[in-house]
From Swiss-Prot:
Pfam families: Trp_syntA. It comes from Buchnera aphidicola subsp. Diuraphis noxia. Tetramer of two alpha and two beta chains. GO terms for cellular component: cytosol. This is Tryptophan synthase alpha chain. The gene is trpA. GO terms for molecular function: tryptophan synthase activity. It catalyses: (1S,2R)-1-C-(indol-3-yl)glycerol 3-phosphate + L-serine = D-glyceraldehyde 3-phosphate + L-tryptophan + H2O. The alpha subunit is responsible for the aldol cleavage of indoleglycerol phosphate to indole and glyceraldehyde 3-phosphate.
Length: 270
């Protein structure tokens, strides 16, 4: 079994959902982001989703856009990011590590070179945020060559044709959107309906994780109890980073408390 299969199997046995925090590598600095990642792991993260900074992150709301800009201002490059991911992997051998990246960054590296770097660094999955499923075959094929899982986004209004397409390619997990649009917590709570979850599961047995706007324990409990395998939480964590940019000790404490609280909410048996 790969790392995703292992973690989902273990969590299922313990009757827990999977908690996946998202942060942007290099935000607010590379050293601080690595401290944050270690705090996330130490306090309940079951897997990681790490954003590679990009100048025009169209799929993301203002919170994550600003995180990308802060990271880009540090003038790090993709080679440094892969180096630090490799160091993370040496320290944390079992946690699944996924990347969220935009297509231009992959093309700039060359597909084979990019996925080879992922493999050598210990990356488990890649989600390319701006590539629709109908244009994904070249990425998926190359990812498979290097045993990297391709993660695909499933919107809440997906029709049968899209669900079928996703079922052909999805590995690791499927990223189920709480709502259409971009990331962030500006909107009211959105819950994925049980009927829609059943519909997705008709096509695929890959675990389903809900993302976009996850910011409190009610949302987490609702997601797990409705049949999803877990949640992805990004903007709420990045808001903490932004709020305490110049108070690192407080930032780390607030992130620790938040992650512990949301991870506790994934447990179906208290």
């Amino acid at each position: 079994m790969n790392r995703y299969e292992n973690i989902f199997d273990r969590l299922s046995q313990r009757k827990e959902g999977c908690f996946v925090p998202f942060v942007v590598l290099g935000d607010p600095s590379l050293d601080t982001s690595l401290k944050i990642i270690n705090i996330l792991i130490q306090n309940g993260a079951d897997a990681l989703e790490l954003g590679i900074p990009f100048s025009d992150p169209l799929a993301d709301g203002k919170t994550i856009q600003k995180a990308n800009l802060r990271a880009l201002s540090q003038k790090n490059n993709i080679f440094q990011y892969f180096k630090e991911i490799k160091n993370l992997r040496k320290k944390h051998t079992q946690i699944p590590i996924g990347l969220l990246i935009y297509a231009n960054l992959v093309y700039n590296q060359g597909l084979d070179n990019f996925y080879l770097k992922c493999r050598k660094s210990g990356v488990d999955s890649v989600l390319i945020a701006d590539v629709p499923i109908e244009e994904s075959e070249i990425f998926y094929t190359t990812a498979n060559k290097y045993k990297i899982s391709s993660i695909f986004i499933c919107p809440p209004n997906a029709d049968d044709d899209l669900l079928y397409r996703i079922s052909l390619y999805a590995k690791g997990y499927i990223y189920v959107l709480s709502r259409p649009g971009v990331t962030g917590i500006e909107n009211q709570n959105f819950f994925v309906s049980g009927d829609f979850i059943k519909k997705i599961k008709k096509y695929n047995s890959v675990p389903l994780l809900q993302g976009f706007g996850i910011s409190n324990s009610i949302q987490v409990k609702q997601a797990i109890s409705s049949g999803l395998s877990g949640v992805i939480c990004g903007s709420a964590i990045i808001n903490i980073i932004e709020k305490y940019l110049y108070e690192e000790d407080i930032m780390m404490t607030k992130i620790q408390e938040f992650v512990k609280h949301l991870k506790k909410s994934t447990k179906l048996i208290a």
